[in-house]
Amino acid sequence: MATVPEIKIMRSESLGHRSDVSSPEAKLGMRVEDLWDEQKPQLSPNEKLNACFESIPVSAFPLSSDSQDIEIRSDTSLAEAVQTLSKFKVLSAPVVDVDAPEDASWIDRYIGIVEFPGIVVWLLHQLEPPSPRSPAVAASNGFSHDFTTDVLDNGDSAVTSGNFFEVLTSSELYKNTKVRDISGTFRWAPFLALQKENSFLTMLLLLSKYKMKSIPVVDLGVAKIENIITQSGVIHMLAECAGLLWFEDWGIKTLSEVGLPIMSKDHIIKIYEDEPVLQAFKLMRRKRIGGIPVIERNSEKPVGNISLRDVQFLLTAPEIYHDYRSITTKNFLVSVREHLEKCGDTSAPIMSGVIACTKNHTLKELILMLDAEKIHRIYVVDDFGNLEGLITLRDIIARLVHEPSGYFGDFFDGVMPLPENYRV
């Protein structure tokens, strides 16, 4: 039986060094190296990096193998969309408008990006009490009147019981809801995209200061997305640059030297292992965060991590919770790990347990670990394993560049970053 893994403290001696200078990311790093050598000596290291990244177009960023050619039609059911995102292990995918004309431009061809945060919004909306309370309303959604009454009468205990998600995922509502029906949860309207000639600096600032997790790159002459650059992709690029002068000059700094972690233990949103798993997703939605640590009640030590992408395991494998009277965060973690072990998928981030570091680790060590483990956050602990802080991919990218005064100008004109009903 799977158990909750112990905290894994990052050890610098186990990280190794990059040696594949032929990778596209390493070649890109060497391009930065050449530009670094050309910068004026009076510039600070941060100013040099800004100048280097401003000189490189985003078209030079290696194509993403994870998200290439993964598009979802607007008439795809939500159930199929969840299966697609889960199958290809991606957090999001662009949605193609099936009603768009064949000669449509890219901005008319796509209606947005569907992502797990939006799916969480939809899921939690289904758990709100239906109104009016009638058999007809329940039947129209594909639920039995008895099941709806149970949810109303028993509240959270009903929606966290082991069979709730089996009923939900077999309902007509889940099967018939289309991706276009949840377009109000899309992060951008339709979404913010970069043109191929935009700079790396623009891209890095959007992924850090402006909190975008992924950015489509488009060619105005082509009605198709050319590439999708993610925070994880940038971290992988940086990991491939280990050994290069500019990277070593920046990466040798310790976390405490660069002001990390930004978020201290008193401000971390957390959940205890005996609380309902849906409470974790509610907290992530309410606080607009991508993940949350699961804490042991007695010791206050982190024993796991639940991220927004993990909602897929409630919807793609609801049968694994059938025997539980209540799906707590601990039950959820144990069940998902057992399920993935049986499926032979031991590389999923949820299998890693708690990956942690200390304030004495360097940026380079942190980047190599995040890239190796394919995770989006790392917890900072003290010598006794107690939680001290949290560092995300965005925090690291934000330490790489800074925004010059007036840099974006009218770049955001006409863009709607967050729809009114977007709550993640």
UniProtKB/Swiss-Prot annotation:
Induction: Strongly induced in the dark.
Keyword Transferase carried by entry: no
Tissue distribution: Expressed in vegetative organs and, to lower extent, in reproductive organs.
Xref: SUPFAM superfamilies: CBS-domain pair (SSF54631)
Subcellular location, record wording: Mitochondrion
Residues recorded as bearing N-acetylalanine in the entry: A2
Entry-linked InterPro entries: AMPK_gamma/SDS23_families (IPR050511), CBS_dom (IPR000644), CBS_dom_sf (IPR046342)
Post-translational modification: Sumoylated by SIZ1.
Domain CBS: 63-131, 185-244, 263-324, 350-408
Job description of the protein: Regulatory subunit of the probable trimeric SNF1-related protein kinase (SnRK) complex, which may play a role in a signal transduction cascade regulating gene expression and carbohydrate metabolism in higher plants. The SnRK complex may also be involved in the regulation of fatty acid synthesis by phosphorylation of acetyl-CoA carboxylase and in assimilation of nitrogen by phosphorylating nitrate reductase.
Protein name as it appears in the record: SNF1-related protein kinase regulatory subunit gamma-1
Organism: Arabidopsis thaliana (Mouse-ear cress)
